[in-house]
Amino acid sequence: MVHIMFNQAAQELTTIRDVLRFAVSRFNEAGLFFGHGTDNAHDEAAYLILHTLNLPLDMLAPYLDAKLLEAEKEEVLTVIERRAVEHIPAAYLTHQAWQGEFDFYVDERVIIPRSFIYELLGDGLRPWIEYDELVHNALDLCTGSGCLAIQMAHHYPDAQIDAVDVSLDALEVAGINVEDYGLEERIRLIHTDLFEGLEGTYDLIVSNPPYVDAESVELLPEEYLHEPELALGSGADGLDATRQILLNAAKFLNPKGVLLVEIGHNRDVLEAAYPELPFTWLETSGGDGFVFLLTREQLLGEE
């Protein structure tokens, strides 16, 4: 049911400033969760309004007092109401998600890009990968939208990249993004479950696998219910996929190869399960407990 305030707003709101204020109030009233691109009601509302009106996303102030046409107002308020009532993440409403300077097409076939791994590509992996030109073959496990594979292609200009996912739906979305960036000759999309059926070895393997434990899956905010469950949950402790990666990665790494994996809030659980592995935890904007690095030698117990 459309919220009763929608019709009132359509009649009484005039400017972008009016609609922005209304949207912030509406989002706060609805108790929305923010974390798929913005972290507060104001920024979320501003993004949705600017995107819907085809205005620059970084130029809200000059347009605040601009009056809206009736058709524009209806379109913007419809988006605001869908966000408030259905708890659909903004990225699914706009079909656009950002990571750094890169933007990607997304829909409900893939999770919304939010991995910290992209921050580490290039300079963040020194000294393990001393020069970007040393990466000739790379692998992105659980590629989803293809965002990390595309950013690897940017940071490692000489690399050929395999991007793997068990979901054909996800690979269709990844294909859209790979084509948008003109990387069809450098990124190969592969339908398989982690390493199954892969051949060859890689200088760099990255993965943002499912890592939410069973109990936490049940407690996720409503917004997460719009994301594919396959890409979120990973067994009782959240480590099912990570265990398979740790078990098999060494066989697919070159002698100086590096494994980079994001595991959410599972650092303590992982270290307790693998006390013999010398995990290096890399600093990201989220802290130093989300992404670990292991070399091939460390995985084999040779270092």
Curated annotation (Swiss-Prot):
InterPro entries found in the cross-reference section: DNA_methylase_N6_adenine_CS, HemK-like, Ribosome_uL3_MTase, SAM-dependent_MTases_sf, Small_mtfrase_dom
Gene3D superfamilies named in the record: DNA helicase RuvA subunit, C-terminal domain, Vaccinia Virus protein VP39
Known EC number: 2.1.1.298
Alphabetized UniProt keyword annotations: Methyltransferase, S-adenosyl-L-methionine, Transferase
Pfam families: MTS (PF05175)
Gene Ontology MF term list: nucleic acid binding; protein-glutamine N-methyltransferase activity
GO terms classed as biological process: methylation
Catalytic activity: L-glutaminyl-[ribosomal protein uL3] + S-adenosyl-L-methionine = N(5)-methyl-L-glutaminyl-[ribosomal protein uL3] + S-adenosyl-L-homocysteine + H(+)
An example Gene Ontology CC term for this record: cytosol
Function: Methylates large ribosomal subunit protein uL3 on a specific glutamine residue.
Protein family membership: Belongs to the protein N5-glutamine methyltransferase family. PrmB subfamily.
NCBIfam families: hemK_fam, L3_gln_methyl
Protein name, UniProt field: Ribosomal protein uL3 glutamine methyltransferase
Lineage, top ranks: Bacteria, Pseudomonadati, Pseudomonadota, Betaproteobacteria, Neisseriales
